[in-house]
Design a protein with these regions (language model features):
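N-terminal cap/lid segment of alpha/beta-hydrolase-fold proteins
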Residues: 24-62
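Short beta-strand element of the alpha/beta-hydrolase
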Residues: 62-74
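Structural cue for short, hydrophobic secondary-structure segments
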Residues: 70-73, 100, 124
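Short amphipathic alpha-helix adjacent to the substrate-entry channel of hydrolases
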Residues: 82-99
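Primarily recognizes the serine-hydrolase "nucleophile elbow" in alpha/beta-hydrolase
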Residues: 123-188, 204
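C-terminal catalytic histidine-bearing segment of alpha/beta-hydrolase fold enzymes
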Residues: 224-227, 244-288
Length: 288
C-alpha cells in the first residue's frame, strides 16, 4: 500500500471517529436531564432517594402528565436508580414523567422494609404531583427482577400502602419485567436467596405476590416473562379479570437482563421492540 493510500485511510478513519464522537454527544445532549437524589423518606439515607425525569416541553404545556415509577433489579442486594438504560428517554418521549427510585438493600433491610420504601416513594410522588405536573390519578409502577417482585407485592398486599395512608387503588397499573411472583417456588429453584427471605416457608409465602392475587382493588398488570410459568398467567388473569395470556409477553430470544436493557430502545432487537410496544399499549390504555 502506498503512502498516499495510507494517508487516505487514516483520514477516513479520523472522520468516522469524529462522527461517532459527535453522535455520542448529541445522544447524551438529547437525554432528559433528571432532578436527582430527591429524598422521599424522612431520612438522609441515599438508598431512599429518587430521580425525576420530566417530559420535554412540560413547562410550556402546563398540563399534567401520567407518571411511571421504576424499581431496578439486583437480587434485593444491588442495583441503582441511575441504571435506567433507554427507559427515561422512552417514557418522557411518550409524555410521561419518569421516576427511578432506590430502595434499601439486603443486608441493611429485609424485603418488607424494601416494600415500605416503595410505598413511601409512591406517596411522595402523589403528594408532590402538582409540583411536577403529575396527574395523581395516573400513577403507574414498573419493576425489573427484584424490583418487579416489590412492585407486585406492594400492589397486591395492601399492608404497605395502608401504612402511608394509601390503598392499591392509588396505583393505576403495574408492569412486571421478569420478576418472581412466588417466592416459595423461587427459593426452591435458587436456595441462596434464603439469605434475603429467611429459612421459614411461612415468610416466603408472606413475601409472595401470588398470595394476595385474589384481593380486591388490585391494579391491572402486564407481565414480561422469560419462561413458561402457569402461575404468571393466573396472576395476570386474577388482576385483570380477563384471559391471562392477553397480559403476558413471553420472550424467547432475550435474556433476563437483556429484556430490561433493551426496553424502550429504538436500537433494540426485534423481539425487544415488540415487547416495548406491547407494554406501552397496555400502559396507554390504562391511562386514557
Amino acid at each position: 500500500m502506498t503512502l498516499n493510500r495510507i494517508m487516505k485511510w487514516l483520514l477516513f478513519a479520523a472522520v468516522i471517529a469524529g462522527l461517532l464522537v459527535c453522535a455520542f454527544f448529541v445522544f447524551r445532549f438529547n437525554q432528559p436531564k433528571p432532578t436527582t437524589n430527591i429524598h422521599y423518606a424522612d431520612t438522609q439515607n441515599k438508598q431512599q432517594t429518587l430521580d425525576m425525569y420530566m417530559p420535554k416541553g412540560k413547562d410550556e404545556d402546563k398540563k399534567k402528565h401520567p407518571v411511571m415509577i421504576y424499581l431496578h433489579g439486583g437480587g434485593w442486594t444491588g442495583g441503582d436508580k441511575n441504571r435506567v438504560a433507554s427507559k427515561a428517554d422512552y417514557f418522557t418521549g411518550q409524555g410521561y414523567v419518569f421516576v427511578s427510585m432506590n430502595y434499601r438493600l439486603h443486608p441493611d433491610a429485609n424485603y418488607g422494609q424494601m416494600a415500605d420504601d416503595t410505598a413511601n416513594a409512591i406517596k411522595w410522588v402523589k403528594d408532590h404531583a402538582d409540583e411536577y405536573q403529575i396527574d395523581s390519578s395516573k400513577i403507574n409502577v414498573m419493576g425489573h427482577s427484584a424490583g418487579g417482585h416489590l412492585t407486585a407485592l406492594v400492589a397486591t398486599d395492601s399492608t404497605y400502602l395502608k401504612r402511608v395512608g394509601l390503598s392499591p387503588k392509588t396505583i393505576n397499573s403495574i408492569v412486571i419485567l421478569d420478576g418472581p411472583l412466588n417466592i416459595n417456588q423461587f427459593i426452591q429453584a435458587i436456595p441462596s436467596y434464603k439469605k434475603v427471605f429467611g429459612k421459614q416457608e411461612e415468610n416466603w409465602t408472606k413475601a409472595s405476590p401470588v398470595t394476595y392475587m385474589n384481593q380486591k382493588n388490585v391494579p391491572p398488570v402486564y407481565l414480561v416473562t422469560g419462561w413458561e410459568n402457569p402461575e404468571v398467567y393466573r396472576f395476570a388473569e386474577k388482576l385483570n379479570h380477563e384471559k391471562g395470556s392477553n397480559f403476558v409477553f413471553r420472550v424467547h430470544s432475550l435474556s433476563h437482563s437483556d429484556l430490561n436493557k433493551w426496553f424502550g430502545s429504538d436500537r433494540a432487537p426485534k423481539e425487544a421492540q415488540e415487547m416495548t410496544k406491547a407494554v406501552m399499549a397496555f400502559v396507554k390504555k390504562q391511562n386514557q
